[in-house]
C-alpha cells in the first residue's frame, strides 16, 4: 500500500521507528503542487506534517487514488480538510501525543520571560555582564509562584499545563467553549470568559485550534486589557493573534512580554517582532511540541492508523472532518 509522506525519512530514524513492511512509504520533499500531484499517483494515503506545507483543494481534486489523509500533530491545517470531506476523504490528526512537550515549553517560556534569561545570556556574550545585570535588577524579575495562569483552550494541551502550573504554585483559570466540568472541578481550574481571562490573569497561554471563531481573536483591544506585567504565550497557531496589534502592544510597553512559537512571517526581515528586544519577546520556530519522545508517539500512532485503514480495512481513528468511509473490500 503506497503512502506518500511529506515528512522526511529522518523523522522516523531519529525517533527510532521501524517502518512497517505492510506499508510502502515514499518520501517527498515539499516541491510544489504539480510535483506533489505527480508523486501521489497510485498512492492510497498522504502522511503530512501538522501545519506546513499546505495541501490545497487544487491538489486534492487531482489525487483520485487518495483514500485517507493523516497528519502527525494535533493540528490539521496542513490540508484543506473541508475539500477532503467533500471528496469523501477522511482526515485524521494525532491528538494528545505532544501535549506534555508543549506544556513543558509553556512553563519554560514563562520563566524565561519573567526572569529575562535568554536576553541576559545574549547580553553577556556581547560583553555586557554588568550592564545587563543592572537592567534586570532595575526591572525586577518576577516569581512564578502565586501567579494566575490563564489557558485559552482546555483540551489535551491545556490540561497538560495545569499540573505543571500547580507544581509551581500557580492558580489556573481557563476559557473553553466545551468546558470539561469534571476535570476542572478535580483540578481547581476557574472558569472565565475570554475578556476576564485576558484582563485578570498574569499569563495567558493560547491552546486553541485555528478556525473561523478564533482567527484574529487576540487583537489590540483584548491585548490592551492585560495587566502591565502580563505575558502572552502562543504555542497554538499564528492566525489566532493579530500580529501587528501584538507588536504594537509590545512596542508601547503595555505588557511585559510574549513568547511566540508560531508567527506568520517565519523570521523574515519584515517580521515586526525582530525589532523588539529579546528581553520582551521570545521567538521559536514552531518547536513547542517537537521532542524525540513526542515525535515517536505521533509517528507510531500515525503508522498504526494507516495500517488500520489500508491493510485491515477498518475505519480510521481520530477523524477531524466528519468522513467515516467504508474501507472493507
Question: Can you describe what each PLM-predicted range is?
Answer:
Residues 1-92, 219:
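An N-terminal-biased, well-structured beta-alpha scaffold segment characteristic
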Residues 36-41, 60-63, 144, 196-201, ...:
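A short, aliphatic-rich alpha-helical micro-motif
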Residues 54-56, 177-273:
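Rossmann-like adenosine-cofactor binding region
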Residues 87, 95-148, 163:
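Phosphate-binding beta-alpha-beta segment of Rossmann-like dinucleotide-binding domains, i.e.
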Residues 91, 229-231, 235-329:
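Rossmann-like dinucleotide-binding domain for NAD(H)/NADP(H)
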Residues 154-155:
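Glycine-rich Rossmann-fold phosphate-binding loop(s) that bind the pyrophosphate
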Residues 158-159:
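N-terminal Rossmann-fold NAD(P) dinucleotide-binding loop
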Residues 173:
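Conserved beta-strand positions in the Rossmann-like core of class I SAM-dependent methyltransferases
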Amino acid at each position: 500500500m503506497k503512502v506518500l509522506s511529506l515528512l522526511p525519512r529522518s523523522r522516523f530514524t531519529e525517533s527510532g521507528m521501524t517502518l512497517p513492511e505492510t506499508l510502502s512509504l515514499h518520501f517527498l520533499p515539499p516541491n510544489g503542487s504539480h510535483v506533489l500531484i505527480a508523486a501521489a499517483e497510485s498512492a492510497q494515503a498522504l502522511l503530512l506534517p501538522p501545519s506546513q506545507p499546505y495541501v490545497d483543494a487544487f491538489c486534492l481534486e487531482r489525487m483520485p487514488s487518495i483514500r485517507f489523509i493523516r497528519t502527525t500533530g494535533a493540528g490539521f491545517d496542513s490540508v484543506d480538510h473541508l475539500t477532503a470531506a467533500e471528496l469523501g476523504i477522511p482526515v485524521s490528526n494525532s491528538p494528545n501525543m505532544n501535549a506534555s512537550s508543549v506544556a513543558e515549553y509553556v512553563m519554560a517560556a514563562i520563566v524565561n520571560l519573567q526572569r529575562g534569561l535568554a536576553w541576559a545570556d545574549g547580553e553577556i556574550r556581547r560583553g555586557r555582564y554588568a550592564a545587563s545585570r543592572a537592567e534586570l535588577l532595575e526591572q525586577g524579575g518576577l516569581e512564578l509562584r502565586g501567579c494566575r495562569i490563564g489557558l485559552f483552550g482546555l483540551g489535551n494541551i491545556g490540561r497538560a499545563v495545569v499540573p505543571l502550573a500547580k507544581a509551581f504554585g500557580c492558580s489556573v483559570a481557563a476559557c473553553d467553549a466545551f468546558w470539561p466540568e469534571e476535570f476542572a472541578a478535580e483540578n481547581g481550574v476557574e472558569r472565565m470568559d475570554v475578556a476576564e481571562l485576558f484582563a485578570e490573569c498574569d499569563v495567558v497561554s493560547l491552546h486553541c485550534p485555528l478556525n473561523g471563531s478564533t482567527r484574529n481573536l487576540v487583537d489590540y483591544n483584548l491585548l490592551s486589557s492585560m495587566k502591565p506585567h502580563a505575558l502572552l504565550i502562543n504555542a497554538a497557531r499564528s492566525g489566532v493573534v493579530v500580529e501587528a496589534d501584538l507588536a504594537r502592544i509590545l512596542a508601547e510597553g503595555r505588557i511585559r512580554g510574549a513568547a511566540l512559537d508560531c508567527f506568520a512571517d517565519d523570521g523574515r526581515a519584515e517580521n515586526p517582532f525582530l525589532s523588539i528586544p529579546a528581553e520582551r519577546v521570545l521567538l521559536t520556530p514552531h518547536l513547542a511540541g517537537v521532542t524525540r519522545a513526542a515525535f515517536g508517539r505521533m509517528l507510531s500512532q500515525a503508522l498504526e492508523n494507516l495500517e488500520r485503514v489500508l491493510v485491515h480495512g477498518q475505519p480510521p481513528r481520530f477523524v477531524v472532518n466528519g468522513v467515516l468511509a467504508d474501507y472493507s473490500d
